[in-house]
Amino acid sequence: DTLKSEKNADFKDLY
């Protein structure tokens, strides 16, 4: 899922 991947990247960027 692209949306899930994008959200995952956002979370990784946060941490």
From Swiss-Prot:
Keywords: Calcium, Collagen degradation, Extracellular matrix, Hydrolase, Metalloprotease, Phosphoprotein, Protease, Secreted, Zinc
Post-translational modifications: The N-terminus is blocked. Tyrosine phosphorylated in platelets by PKDCC/VLK.
Catalytic activity annotation: Cleavage of the triple helix of collagen at about three-quarters of the length of the molecule from the N-terminus, at 775-Gly-|-Ile-776 in the alpha1(I) chain. Cleaves synthetic substrates and alpha-macroglobulins at bonds where P1' is a hydrophobic residue
Entry EC number(s): 3.4.24.7
The keyword Iron is annotated on this UniProt entry: no
Cofactors required: Ca(2+); Zn(2+)
Activity regulation (UniProt): Can be activated without removal of the activation peptide.
EC main group: hydrolase
Gene Ontology biological process terms from the UniProt entry: cellular response to alkaloid; cellular response to fluid shear stress; cellular response to interleukin-1; cellular response to iron(III) ion; cellular response to lipopolysaccharide; cellular response to peptide hormone stimulus; cellular response to tumor necrosis factor; cellular response to UV-A
Compartments (UniProt record): Secreted, Extracellular space, Extracellular matrix
Cellular component terms (Gene Ontology): extracellular space
Main location: secreted
Function: Cleaves collagens of types I, II, and III at one site in the helical domain. Also cleaves collagens of types VII and X. May play a role in the deterioration of the heart wall extracellular matrix proteins during the onset of dilated cardiomyopathy.
Protein name per Swiss-Prot or TrEMBL: Interstitial collagenase
Species: Rattus norvegicus
